Amino acid sequence: MVVAKKSLGQHFLMDESFLDRIVNALPPLNSLRLIEIGVGLGDLTLKLLDRYPLKTYEIDSNLCEKMRARLRAEKKPFQLELVEKDALFLKEEEPYFLISNLPYYIATRLVLNALKDPKCRGLLVMTQKEVALKFCAKDSQNALSVLAHTIGNATLLFDVPPSAFSPPPKVFSSVFEVIKEPLKEKALASLAQAPFFEEALQKGFETLEDFLKACFSSPRKTLSNNLKKSVSYKEKLDKVLDFLALENQPTSVRASEVKDYLKLLKSVLKG
């Protein structure tokens, strides 16, 4: 019997209907490699192997051993490459699509890593509902939604109740997807100077991420007050105010009220 480890944020999805809904929600992969973070008890992994070849990253050696045992007992039409490694160090050489029931405590960081990675073309993940809502929020409600919608389209798909897991978490989970869009990536890459597009895209994402941290540092305060406290951007506050004036937005706006962060950042970086 496998006991979930609190230190790794393990909650195993057991409900067959939700496992099927996740697999059925995958978009057409075409030639993309499918990458999974966290093998868990193997239930989602085995369902995926009925349809796709799969590479899975799992840090827990006990779960890796259980997965190997299940594969010996249950033959599948497609092969699994099981990598016993921390997914924070996930690095692929070919384009891929990410799928995962992410551990709550590290979900945001793993999603941001995937969004930042030019090789990742999209993701379908389950997180704590609160986190999913942040990534999928419209307009500029928070930094995570700006990042997700600047590089692609983020969509909340469905909720999963605590009763679907073992052990049950204290909160609801949600499944959402982010599908990257080449035109948005091109615009994001234009923020950076680099010899190769993928390098420019990654640098552009990191530049926007850093800017948003400053803008949303105190969400209830005005944008200008937040930037005044920023070592990196306080000297460029005049450019921000000029941009807001051109966009017919008051200088007292909060970060969540800015209409176009990519356009704003381009204006700030110019000259």
Swiss-Prot record:
Q: Which family does it belong to?
A: Belongs to the class I-like SAM-binding methyltransferase superfamily. rRNA adenine N(6)-methyltransferase family. RsmA subfamily.
Q: Which GO terms describe its molecular function?
A: 16S rRNA (adenine(1518)-N(6)/adenine(1519)-N(6))-dimethyltransferase activity; RNA binding
Q: Which SUPFAM superfamilies match?
A: S-adenosyl-L-methionine-dependent methyltransferases
Residues involved in S-adenosyl-L-methionine binding: H11, L13, G38, E58, D86, N101
**Keywords of this entry:** Cytoplasm, Methyltransferase, RNA-binding, rRNA processing, S-adenosyl-L-methionine, Transferase
Gene encoding the protein:
rsmA
GO CC field = cytosol
Organism, per UniProt? Helicobacter pylori (strain J99 / ATCC 700824) (Campylobacter pylori J99)
Catalytic activity reads: adenosine(1518)/adenosine(1519) in 16S rRNA + 4 S-adenosyl-L-methionine = N(6)-dimethyladenosine(1518)/N(6)-dimethyladenosine(1519) in 16S rRNA + 4 S-adenosyl-L-homocysteine + 4 H(+)
Q: What class of enzyme is it?
A: transferase
Tell me the protein's name: Ribosomal RNA small subunit methyltransferase A
